[in-house]
Amino acid sequence: MNMLSCDTSHVKSLNVQGLTKLNTLSCGNNELESLDLSGLSALTGVDCQNNKLKILNLVGTTMLTAVYATKNELESLDLKDCVELAELYCNSNKLTALDVKTATKLKVFDCSSNNLSQDAFKKLFESLPQREVGDNATCLIYTEETGVAEGNYKTFTEDELKVAKDKNWKVYKNSASHVQEAL
């Protein structure tokens, strides 16, 4: 089996252990509280948005290039084995820290609407991989949209953003009018 799709199926649990040839998993819009993808070394993409995930186990997912984990209840996310990761959408969770240092191919991520403090952002920016100007690497770090809970630190100084910008990352926020604005 190369692909498994069970979106919007009212699924409360999903066992994918042993599906060693699985490339793509799409299980968004369900009621999952945990998802164990450990050891799925052929997995390149996972879409688990709009669940109730408190645990997303990515240990051994060394080929994973894209993670869509928006709108869950994740408090932590271990990406240490995600060495091929290029896209990460973990916005609208409860993350208090995010370390992407092993994701050396990362070019796009959204971590808005979490619980990332000033210190957590300092560590996150330090962990960002160096990019080339032509990579157009972007990160969306907070939102000002009406009706969206934002727990992230928002009052960045130029010096705080300089670490990311010096690595050729474009840093954005979502404005109240739903437009991405450069910081």
Task: Give the positions of each predicted feature.
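N-terminal capping/linker segments that flank leucine-rich repeat
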Residues: 1-20, 41, 62, 104, ...
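Acidic, glycine-rich calcium-binding repeat modules characteristic of RTX/beta-roll
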Residues: 88-91, 95-113, 119-120
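Consensus "Asn ladder" position of solenoid repeat domains
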Residues: 9, 30, 51, 72, ...
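Conserved hydrophobic position(s) of the canonical leucine-rich repeat
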Residues: 1, 11, 22, 32, ...
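Conserved hydrophobic beta-strand positions in leucine-rich repeat
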Residues: 1-6, 23-27, 44-48, 56, ...
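Canonical leucine-rich repeat
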Residues: 14-16, 35-37, 56-58, 77-79, ...
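Ser/Thr- (and often Asn-) enriched beta-sheet segments in non-cytosolic proteins
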Residues: 13, 34, 54-57, 96, ...
